[in-house]
């Protein structure tokens, strides 16, 4: 296929070429893979600046998206690639193949650094949030070999929170902008927030810290949002509210108030902390909950009833249903002839319109999956606190190439934690927009623009 770059794509490609260290914050659907591959081809065969390139990506993206994109575009002809997946022997063979581009799953980074001589002069990290934790082994191991690469590119749809930025940017620039040690970064830009006499549980940014941090990374960062650059179809977000019966609501409220719900047959459902409580309340809002013995206790079918109405009204139009808990999936499958989206074959069948009702878990539907050809309606049966997973799944349908209006349906149980989750997602999105604007690239009339003090770059 011939590649005709949009202005923003050419700008982003030129940015990679012009910056040995670069961070591209590109909204879903903008084509960050082909943008990056175009820059890699030019650096390999026009500028002769690099010899071997390592691409680190989530497993499914490494297996399917990057190889497919290299094969897809005519202008990338001549670029050889190898996929370092499978058994240790297969991974080793790919890494030693001498291919121009070697693609490896992020979960194999530590294995690679321990078993293979690092012989890459450029590294591409897709998705940058994979390295947001300085305590993660993959971060520590990649950090050891990072100085051997003279060029590095970080790709992400969204930057992490301010504390995460230290690791995400540090793995790119080796601590030049935000400091070499997490303790120094924390002391410089943050103040203790929630704490008791001995333990600090969380930190909050100092006044003006946010603007200063974005200013420090602005020279290597560009950010683009799809709505600014693409002729996208309309996206409509709906809320389908369901209500529990009085007795069901009493059970829900009692657990919220008392943290422990006496639930029949002597089984206690114990939420010992806020996270566990939220988890239990989410399950109950969906209609079932695991007790302490791991058994599923049904509470209501309100969301299943609402889902039945949506399936009926779709009249054969494909629906992509997002679930979170295993019992959500089991209850949906028991009631409807749905099919999971897990394998390459599942994705192909979905895009060919062969799956009227599809099930997908947000954590397995992240970066790089193209599902826009198979449907345009997402139903969030289970909501998620993760803004990143929420946006990533929505962007599987609401992206370049989508020809129809995208409908996002949220099943919300009235008077439950579901309402809190939707509010949190909206609040996080507002904060994220502020962060993105601080480093946003402007084209045509716009400027170019756990704790340990010993963790270091």
Residue ranges and their predicted role:
Residues 405-407, 411-457:
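Non-catalytic, charged low-complexity extensions flanking SF2 helicase motor domains
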Residues 1-25:
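Conserved pre-motif I regulatory segment
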Residues 1, 18, 30-31, 35-45, ...:
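Conserved Helicase C-terminal RecA-like lobe
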Residues 105, 329, 337-424, 428:
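Conserved RecA-like P-loop NTPase helicase motor core
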Residues 88-120:
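Conserved helix/coil segment N-terminal to the catalytic DExD/H
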Residues 35, 50-72, 160-164, 324-325:
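Conserved Walker A/P-loop ATP-binding site and its immediately adjacent core
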Residues 52, 78, 97, 122, ...:
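Conserved P-loop NTPase motor "coupling/switch" region that bridges the ATPase
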Residues 61-86, 172-175:
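Conserved helix-turn-beta segment of the N-terminal RecA-like "Helicase ATP-binding" lobe
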């Amino acid at each position: 296929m011939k590649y005709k770059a949009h202005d923003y794509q050419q700008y982003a490609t030129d940015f990679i070429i012009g910056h040995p260290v670069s961070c591209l914050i590109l909204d879903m659907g903008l084509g960050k893979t082909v943008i990056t591959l175009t820059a890699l081809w030019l650096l390999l065969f026009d500028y002769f600046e690099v010899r071997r390139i390592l691409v680190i990506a989530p497993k499914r993206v490494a297996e399917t998206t990057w190889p497919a994109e290299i094969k897809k575009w005519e202008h990338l002809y001549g670029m050889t690639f190898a996929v370092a997946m499978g058994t240790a022997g297969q991974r080793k063979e790919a890494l030693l193949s001498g291919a121009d581009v070697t693609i490896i799953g992020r979960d194999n980074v530590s294995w690679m650094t321990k078993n293979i001589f690092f012989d890459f002069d450029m590294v591409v990290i897709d998705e940058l949030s994979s390295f947001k934790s300085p305590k993660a082994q993959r971060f520590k191991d990649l950090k050891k070999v990072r100085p051997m690469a003279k060029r590095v590119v970080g790709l992400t749809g969204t930057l992490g929170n301010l504390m995460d930025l230290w690791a995400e940017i540090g793995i790119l620039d080796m601590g030049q902008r935000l400091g070499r040690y997490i303790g120094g970064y924390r002391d410089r830009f943050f103040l203790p927030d929630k704490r008791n006499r001995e333990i600090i549980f969380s930190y909050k940014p100092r006044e003006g810290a946010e603007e200063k941090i974005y200013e420090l990374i602005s020279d290597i960062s560009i950010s683009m949002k799809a709505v600014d650059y693409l002729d996208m179809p309309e996206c409509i977000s709906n809320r389908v509210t369901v209500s529990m019966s009085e007795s069901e609501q009493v059970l829900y409220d009692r657990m919220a108030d008392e943290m422990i719900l006496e639930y029949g047959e002597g089984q206690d459902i114990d939420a010992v902390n806020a996270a566990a409580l939220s988890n239990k309340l989410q399950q109950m809002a969906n209609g079932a909950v695991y007790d302490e013995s791991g058994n599923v206790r049904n509470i209501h079918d309100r969301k299943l009833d609402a889902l039945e109405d949506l399936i009926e009204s779709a009249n054969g139009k494909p629906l992509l249903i997002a679930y979170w808990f295993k019992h959500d999936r089991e209850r949906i499958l028991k009631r409807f002839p749905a099919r999971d989206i897990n394998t390459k074959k599942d994705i192909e069948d979905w895009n060919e319109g062969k799956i009227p009702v599809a099930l997908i878990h947000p954590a397995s539907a992240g970066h790089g999956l193209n599902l826009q050809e198979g449907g345009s309606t997402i139903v969030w049966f289970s909501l998620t606190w993760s803004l990143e997973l929420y946006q990533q799944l929505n962007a599987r349908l609401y992206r370049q190439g989508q020809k129809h209006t995208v409908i996002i349906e949220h099943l919300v149980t009235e008077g439950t934690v579901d309402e809190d989750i939707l509010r949190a997602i909206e609040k996080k999105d507002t904060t994220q927009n502020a962060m993105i604007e601080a480093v946003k690239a402007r084209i045509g009339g716009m400027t170019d623009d756990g704790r340990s003090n010993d963790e270091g770059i």
